[in-house]
Amino acid sequence: MRPGEESQLVPKEIENAADEPRVLCIVQDTTNCKSVNERITLNLPASTSVKQLYEDVSNKAGYVSSTFSLMWGNGASNTDMAALDPTPDRTLQEAGFEAGKKNFLHLTDKDGEQPQLTSDESGTADSSGLDDSSQEKFIGPLPREESVAGTSNYVSQNYSYSSLLSKSDTGYVGLVNQAMTCYLNSLLQTLFMTPEFRNALYKWEFEESEEDPVSSIPYQLQRLFVLLQTSKKRAIETTDVTRSFGWDSSEAWQQHDVQELCRVMFDALEQKWKQTEQADLINQLYQGKLKDYVKCLECGYESWRIDTFLDIPLVIRPYGSNTAFGSMEEALHAFIQPETLDGPNQYFCERCKRKCDARKGLKFLHFPYLLTLQLKRFDFDYTSMHRIKLNDRMTFPDELDMSPFIDMEDEKSPQTDSCTDSGAENEGSCHSDQMSNDFSTDDAVDEGICLETNSNIEKLNKSVAEKNSLYELFSVMVHSGSAAGGHYYACIKSFADGQWYSFNDQHVSRITQEDIKKTYGGATGNRGYYSSAFASSTNAYMLMYRLKNPARNAQFLEASEFPEHIKLLVQKEQEQEEQEKRQREIERNTCKLKLFCMHPVKQIMMESKLEVHKDKTMKEAVEIANKLMDLEGVIPLDCCRLVKYDEFHDYLERSYEDEEDRTMGYLLGGVKSSYMFDLLLETKRPDQVFQSYKPGEVMVKVYVVDLKTETVASPVSVRAYLSQTIIEFKQLISKSVDLPPDSMRVILERCYNDLRLLNVANKTLKAEGFFRSNKVFVESSDSLDHQLVFTDSHLWKLLDRHANTIKLYVSLPEHPRPTARSVGPKGGGDMNPQEDYCSRAKSVDAILEESTEKLKSLSLQQHQDGGNGDSSKSTEGSDFENIDSPLNEVDSSGSADNRELENRILPADPENNFQPEERSDSDVNNDRSTSSVDSDILSSSHSSDTLCNADGTPIPLANGLDSHSITSSRRSKANDGKKETWDTAEEDSGTDSEYDESGKSRGEAQYMYFKAEPHAGEGCLAEGSKCLLVNVDKRITLAAFKQQLESFVGVPSSQFKVFRVYASNQEFESVRLNETLSSFSDDNKITIRLGRALKKGEYRVKIFQLLVNEPEPCKFVLDAVFSKGMTVRQSKEELLPLLREQCGLDLSIDRFRLRKKTWKNPGTVFLDSHVYENESISSCWEVLLEALDETEKMKSMSQLSLFTKRWRPSELKLDPFKEVVLESNSVEELRDKICEISAIPLENLEFAKGRGTFPCDISVLEIHQDLDWNPKVSTLNAWPLYISDDGAVIFYRDKTEEVMELTDEQRNELVKKESSRLQKTGHRVTYSPRKEKALKIYLDGPTNKDSAQD
């Protein structure tokens, strides 16, 4: 062929390929086999066969082609889709696929089975075909978003920490990290990969009759190891193992040390294996022996003992050195390097009978079969006082020869030479860090060395295998992080194939020798000694070696070699795993959605969760729903059906007529994690016919309004189309409610209080703003009301009232009592309380009885005048009837005519408008008692610590810092002559006044709806209590609401208070009288308590008694009312009788003072001439009352009152408080005053300011050193004293007085006593950082955890 001809062939081929039509296939995966349903797009030639389409989809989706089906509907709707058959040899074009258009297909389950992933077909071995070099390697903590290469992407919904369910391609199974259990996972994987330990564990047989399997540690380890060896899962939970440790869920959030866990777990296993074949297993595998000796350098006498160890702790960096050991061998040599005891550390030689220089050290006598080495990377930095991690580089060999570290002379020499204890543990030591605590029993255990002293030490058995000291590295437990926290994982070499693997919680991957070298630690560049204080790094922390001895080295037991009890356990676990798999399969094919039903008898909407298999038919689903709603025997099954429902809009979307035999998966659009709709189990009477609901319809709730009776009937549901006109809609409504459409007025409520009259006949519902669910009011009367403008009509006012009326449950007080005196300014502004009011008023019982009778007899009355804004709310066709107030008859000017409670509240004087209040109810009550009462009724909120008797349930008082506390110096203000004034008339008032200065009642000139009737049962706060059911317009003010309640409470509105009750039965007082009830909602509960309401300028004040030398220095006494402009002396005069009557405190007016209370601290002393207007006060005002032993010393604002207390070190006790009054803020004057009251010479006096809140309690064991004694200042308002106001605490002492010396027993007793005292008072000022929780394994199970811990 010529070149020219050849060049023409390629364009010809391209041209033919372009001419062939192509089919665009979009495949949606609906199987729920993966966490995210994929969408696959394929653009194939039309000549592609259907079979090839299956293959292409299989490759794209990762499924085996024969395990799924493709649904296709030839371009029709989803409801007509059918399975695409791959067997006939047809092309896509022949099958009906259209070229140039989108062809949508659904990938679905085949025969009810989930598609099989291609990774599942190949098993758990290497199916990728990649060698180790091409595999993605991983070492270190895994990022959350990443996964290990070569693993399956099959999602497990059962294991929250396992992103994949199938086993890793390595063939090994990971462990799920519960929260912070990575240290546990690392050790468990290491033990599992130790053939000798795993095989021995398998040989142990659990006896269920002797022990509970839940608390058996060996059995749970055995189960875990069996699952790790046989399970096909990617990761296994460890919760059963930790539960056998006696741990609860909180233990999973505790970080611990892997070496500590190893020791504790081995101890627990030894305890559990007592009197079994495995009793000595830990010692046989992990225990070594060493000699601890001291040798006299003068006579050669040697004293020694034999110790056992389970692991060898090696320091990274010697104490006091800047250079770390470069290798593990160097650290081992340093471990056995002896130190010389000389100078003050000389050793007392038993032979020489005197102190001599000696050599002290350790010698290894026997190494264990499995050698454990701990690299002590955690240290304490005494400069920064922080725990640090040493990230220095330390190498370790793959094969370790331990023969240089064995003392061969000791092996050859007899062991009977001088076996006495050297007693060196009581001697001083200057050895390096790893030796500093070797002779302390507790510390030695922490280091992994178990001390064992025996006078008759057995001779060491030496075998040929033990002479061989060559060890092979097989596990590196790595810590990544800092001393503050981090992550553990393990690098383990498999003895089966010699390959290294990274076991990082649930992730297992292959690694190489180079990855092991990365765990040596170290960093590039120069690093200072303390540079690693908070550094995060990854390095080896614990190493495990196994002795290379072919005679002893074991191989893992294969499944065929398992003991019989293990085979049974494997079978049991496999059956359980299969059951879990079947259950997961069922879960994946179960449709779960909300189910609602209006109970046909109870007439309440019930809610449940419907779970139905996707292959169940609609008829079967109705049966399930019928049982779920407990309707069996209540209503026949043929009177029930399921319809598509939108609960949020209360909208029936569609019904499923003639589809009873369709599957639920088909009708619901497949199995989904969540649905955008719900189901409603609709019921009917046998004589009724179900209405058909079509998509596109809208639901309308029609309320019929009767203007004559002013009632709103219950709703009737009507379904309409958005395309209907208003005239058609009226005709549709007319058929349902039997009203003439010609005179019908239709009002649409589009949202709250948005009423729209639909009067354009040809306008469509869509144009009027109809949506899925709508609310419509209709009225058809012959009155002239429809001729008025809609907003002026009676219908609009009735609907407006209907929308704003709420139902409240009001609990009344038991017995109205005459109100106590008010504490007010002398000479003016007092309100006339009408003392004979209560005596003339009827009792609550009589009022309720009379009101009930009148409710039965009164006829409905209408108010048609222009100012009539009256409204009522009716439910189920009933109306709120108007009742008159019996108390009003008494109070009226002789009139006996019935008067409605729907009253026009008389307008107040124009100047008596309500003042704005900046604090809401929640703000007011956040820092005040939840149950504030009148001065003669004690607050129940202080019943736990009050000095007086009080009734009611205690409610905790939330104390907080006064937002108006004085932060600047009162003294400087007094000296500068400045005066504090009120910013605005009502700015700091705790409440709006219900009365003006002249005592006139303040009201609102608006007509509001109010109706009250006696109520018993649901809604009442206490059984047997008097309760009202009140229907009220929520636009009424609190003041008007209280006035309407006067007749029922039996006292004027100024003599009771309103408390709102929340879900937790916590009460908050509503005090803002000019606010409406708009924040209230239906069925809210209200409690009425007796107590005088505040007038303008008045403030409710909580009085506390200051008892400086009592354990509880601040006790609540009573509530009082102070007013602006009152002097302190006037308030004291008013308080005296109250204190005498209510609390039994008989005080003289000159023998007590009032002072400011700032949280728990006593503050400024109020002088008798002080006017409260000069003090910044708030609605949550608190004042301290302090009884005096003598007449008042404070005469001027320039004086300063301090509390002083003497510390006696020789007796370890504190004297009572004594008050010192200073004329200035001079330190010299303070020292002189203290000398006067203490008789301490001035040159020996030392003082310090107390810390914390009053009374500044501190332990007697700490006060002598912890306080800042004798500060070098000349004035009290300078640093570090900062004393500028009354109430500061000063401790003082005689510096020549010596501190009492205590024995250990006395000190321990005093520590307990002081700790108990300070805990009771709550005054603990010393700071103690949170201690690390000790790692413990509770052998008696979780029930005895507390006792075991103790």
UniProtKB/Swiss-Prot annotation:
Locations listed in the record: Cytoplasm
Residues the record marks as active site: 182, 487
GO biological process: base-excision repair; DNA damage response; monoubiquitinated protein deubiquitination; proteolysis; regulation of protein stability
Bias-annotated ranges (Low complexity): 929-945
Record-level Gene Ontology MF annotations: cysteine-type deubiquitinase activity
Gene3D superfamilies attached to this UniProt entry: Cysteine proteinases
Coiled coil: none
EC number: 3.4.19.12
Entry-linked InterPro entries: Papain-like_cys_pep_sf (IPR038765), Peptidase_C19 (IPR050164), Peptidase_C19_UCH (IPR001394), Ubiquitin-like_domsf (IPR029071), USP47_C (IPR045578), USP_CS (IPR018200), USP_dom (IPR028889)
Keyword presence, Protease: yes
Keyword tags: Cytoplasm, DNA damage, DNA repair, Hydrolase, Protease, Thiol protease, Ubl conjugation pathway
GO CC annotations on file: cytoplasm; cytosol; nucleus
Annotated Polar residues bias: 115-132, 415-437, 859-877
Biased composition (Acidic residues): 983-996
Catalytic reaction(s) noted: Thiol-dependent hydrolysis of ester, thioester, amide, peptide and isopeptide bonds formed by the C-terminal Gly of ubiquitin (a 76-residue protein attached to proteins as an intracellular targeting signal)
Domain of life: Eukaryota
Disordered: annotated segments: 111-138, 409-437, 815-836, 859-1000
Domain USP: 173-548
Annotated function: Ubiquitin-specific protease that specifically deubiquitinates monoubiquitinated DNA polymerase beta (polb), stabilizing polb thereby playing a role in base-excision repair (BER).
Family affiliation: Belongs to the peptidase C19 family. USP47 subfamily.
Protein name: Ubiquitin carboxyl-terminal hydrolase 47
Organism (species): Xenopus laevis
